[in-house]
Amino acid sequence: MSGPQNPQAGPGGPPSGPPQPGGPPGPPQGPPQPVQQSKRLQQTQAQVEEVVDIMRVNVDKVLERDSKISELDDRADALQAGASQFEASAGKLKRKFWWKNCKMMIILGGIVAVIVTVIIVWAAT
């Protein structure tokens, strides 16, 4: 078997001539490597810009919410102070009317005592 096994190959050399269909697959035919890398870089940069824009919007929303929460907290503090003042005023008013009611009961009791005394004195005579 001294003859060449591949009819396209010379004696002991690599095949010569165009490759036959159905031969070993070569590298995929596509854009050259630098162009593909540039395209991927542009896509990545576009994605980064999109994420940065979204993050800017999110930060703006967080700052807006923070200001609203601060305003709400201030209003809650003012409401708490007003509620405390109302509670103190209501307590004073309650005591005031309780004493007023006690005075009226004492006066009414005195009037009843005078009337009973007058009736007893009048009945005894």
UniProtKB/Swiss-Prot annotation:
Top-level lineage group: Eukaryota
Domain v-SNARE coiled-coil homology span(s) in chain numbering: 40-100
GO cellular component: neuron projection; synaptic vesicle membrane
Chief location bin: membrane
PROSITE patterns with a match to the protein in the record: SYNAPTOBREVIN, V_SNARE
Transmembrane feature ranges: 104-123
Family matches, as CDD domains: R-SNARE_VAMP2 (cd15870)
UniProt entry tagged with the keyword Lipid metabolism: no
InterPro entries attached to this UniProt entry: Synaptobrevin-like (IPR001388), Synaptobrevin/VAMP (IPR016444), V_SNARE_CC (IPR042855)
Membrane topology: Single-pass type IV membrane protein
Compartments where located: Cytoplasmic vesicle, Secretory vesicle, Synaptic vesicle membrane; Synapse, Synaptosome
Pfam families: Synaptobrevin
Single Gene Ontology BP annotation: vesicle-mediated transport
Topological domains annotated Vesicular: 124-125
Keyword terms: Coiled coil, Cytoplasmic vesicle, Membrane, Synapse, Synaptosome, Transmembrane, Transmembrane helix
Functional note: Intrinsic membrane protein of small synaptic vesicles.
Protein name: Synaptobrevin
